[in-house]
Amino acid sequence: CLKGTEHKWLDLYVLFKNWILPSSAPLETELVGIKFFTAPIQAKAAKADDSVSSQARYHQALKNRYSAEIEVVRGYYTMDTVNAKVVDLTNPERRFRECETTLVWKLEEKQSDVNLALHAYHDAITSSVEQVVIVTNDTDIAPVVEMLKKHTSVTVGVVIPTRKHVRYPNGELTKHADWTRTHITDEELAGSQLPPVVMGKRKPTIKPESW
């Protein structure tokens, strides 16, 4: 939901503590921690020259400001060349196996979904939390929500990471949740920004100019 906005320098803790949870969770909620599942951008796949450094700055800013409250859990990207079928533009109905093959780049994020599933289930069965809130619209996470509801006592909320009327919640994901937040508003994003300079133990982290 941050694509194309000026709100990438997002304060996740403020967003959830001040906006998302008070307006969405069915019961009074105490925010005990945030786990941010991500993967470092590969330089050769970056969309801009400063993408890698900007992401690293953001992760460092979160660590500096919320060392106890936010845990950044990293996966990784793989980038390979693979053969892929090309749609025949002159005959879009042409059968898949009859279409020509070409070599393309395939960029995949690894481990993030697995990490999310394991952390959510671990925190639920060890009674570390009474409620798990998952931010996604990915159907791959639907089994996680279903398992949490079937085999643990935690309340499960789902927040769809989109601005209003951009994407609709996936039914396979939300049907198992206790509650769903369908979007995040521009006002909430704007009101949840880190300061331009985030102080650290050794040196400050400065918001990227492109952000």
Label the predicted regions.
Residues 1-92, 97, 101-106, 151, ...:
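Domain-level signal for Mg2+-assisted phosphodiester chemistry and nucleotide/NA-binding surfaces
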Residues 76-211:
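Nuclease catalytic cores that cleave nucleic-acid phosphodiester bonds
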